[in-house]
Every structure is written in structure tokens, then in C-alpha cells.
Amino acid sequence: MSLPGSADDEPVRILHTIYDDMDNPWCGGGGAQRAMEINRRLADRHQIKMLVGNYPGAPAKETKNGVQISRIGSALNYPASRLSYSVLASRALLSESFDLWVYNFSAFSPVLAGARNRNRCILEFFHVLAGHALKKRPLVGLPAILIELYTLGSYSRLIGISPSVLNQIRKRVSGKDLNLVYTGVSQSSFDVAGPTKDYILYFGRLDTYTKGLDLLLKAFSRIGTTHPKVRLILAGRGTEKRIGELQTLSSELGIQDRVEILGPVSEQEKQMLFGGALFKCMPSRYEGWGIAAIETGAAGKAVIGTRIPGLVDAIRHEQTGLLIDPESVA
């Protein structure tokens, strides 16, 4: 991949647009973590500025690990935050000074750019949304699908985060400079220890549809008679609305006494959860990679996940875990 930028001995001014933010309660998962981990490693040689989405109580500007972070858009609610981010990030491309633009694409908060800026851009594609857009957000699903197709066809340099996602892209567009950049895990993922306890673990963003948590709860409700002492723990970031949905579904299924929804946890608590789990579940409907599956493997635990792009690369069937058909609760 040949990149636009300054001479080899000069720092490159990199503008990185990504709605996701590690501290964003609406959308702060593995994509945000990946972006920060890469950027902080580049910050000692280059000038990095990230434009991320706004949320309630967020500082407008801050610097982390040498990376400038600007939060733009409305913090009123999630839809307003997404929409206003698209408008202001698109406008920022006209005023910001940069040599290279890294664009983490999201069909629900696209950034519009002219040909000049597209020519100095690397488009990073985490996953192909396709028909899931209509199921997840019916009101904006069709525009999201069209935006995804248009974006794939409009940029020449693309990065995918798993072989299966790159294959999905190849089926939709041709003649692109496609590159694969995996997502790694921290050393702490290998340092997990502790006795195995009595629970199954889900760790990740508490997004009911995307992560298939409704399927997980329904499947868990079926093992009550055969494994009455086994618990299910859900840990990760999520809005009050999403957590409420999961609590309601648990009650409807009659498993509320065996399901614990922790919400966000510290790194130390995360390691303890991984160390004590019987195994981890990832029943996602779509993924780009599945960093939690790699973290689970590093901790020496098995993963049960869905046979979808991303997870088919992150989980080796019958070696590091099991792959099941999507939507399956049997």
C-alpha cells in the first residue's frame, strides 16, 4: 500500500475519523480500543488527531498517550450524536490540515468527502453490515446499505481486520488496494489465572441485536434443568436502555436469578472474570474480527461463537472453541 504523506524524515499529519470512543457508553467497544492502540504507537513519530463522537459528560478535547482527541457533535442522545457527527466530521475535512486521513467507516455515521480527500485516505472497514442494517435499525436501514455500497466503491485503499471480511469486500467491489491488519491483544490477556468457577461468560458491548444477547439468554434458559447451578455473567459497556432490555428478557425467560449483568468492569475485574469462566460465548449476528475471542484464547479458555465472517477467523472450530450456526439457540 503506497501512502500519501510527507517525506520519510518528517512526521505525517494523520486525521483519524471514527465515531467510536473507548469512553462512549453508546459505542465504545473493540474498534475504539484498536484505534487508540494503533494511534498511540504512531504518536511518537507522527501527529495524530482523532475526531470521535460526543456523549453526555465528555470533555470536548483531550490528549491521551500523545494522541489529540476532539469530540464533535451533539450529546443529547445517541441518534443525535450519530447524525451530528456525520455532518461535523464531513465539514472538518474541509478545514483540518492533514497529510493522511484514516476513515473508520460506519454506515450509521458516514463521513462525506470529495475526490481530493478520498485520494489521501485509507478506509478501514470493520465489518460488512448488508441486510443487518434493516433488521437492526429499520428506519435508516436502507440508506445505510446504500451508503455502505457507495463507500466501498469510492475509495481505492482499504484495510480489513479479518480474511473473511476482506473476502466479503472482494465480492462487492474489484480493483481495490486491499490490506489485512489484524487486531492484537494486550500482554495482560495472557496473565489470567485462577480457579474455574460456575459461570458462563459474555464479555463485550451490551448490544442486544449485534452481539446476539437475546439468543444467548434464550439458549441459556434451556439448560436450567440439566445444569441448574450454572450462572451466566454479562459484562461490558451498555446503555441503561440496553441493560434494561436484557433484564426484562431474563425475567420473561425465568432465569433472572441465574443471570448477572455487571456492566463495565476494570481491567483487574476483567482478568478475574476470564480466569473463572467455564467458557465464553459470542453469539454475534455480525462481527469484523472478535477481539474478545482472541483474549479468551490467550486466557486459555474456550469460546462458543457463531459461524459468521470475523469469528470464523478468530475461533478455530474444535481447537480453540466451537462454531455454531447463526440464530441457533438449540
Predicted regions and their residues:
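Carbohydrate-associated surface elements
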Residues: 164, 184
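Membrane-proximal helix-turn-helix segments that form the acceptor-binding/catalytic region
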Residues: 139-160
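Glycosyltransferase donor-sugar binding loop
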Residues: 203, 231-245
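Nucleotide-activated donor-binding/catalytic signature segment of Leloir-type glycosyltransferases, i.e.
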Residues: 244-265
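Active-site proximal beta-strand in glycosyltransferases
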Residues: 14-15, 100-102, 114-133, 159
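Conserved donor-binding/catalytic core segment of Leloir-type glycosyltransferases
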Residues: 15, 159, 193-211, 217-220, ...
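Short hydrophobic beta-strand element within catalytic cores of glycosyltransferases
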Residues: 293, 302-305
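Aromatic "clamp/platform" in nucleotide-sugar-dependent glycosyltransferases that forms part
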Residues: 285
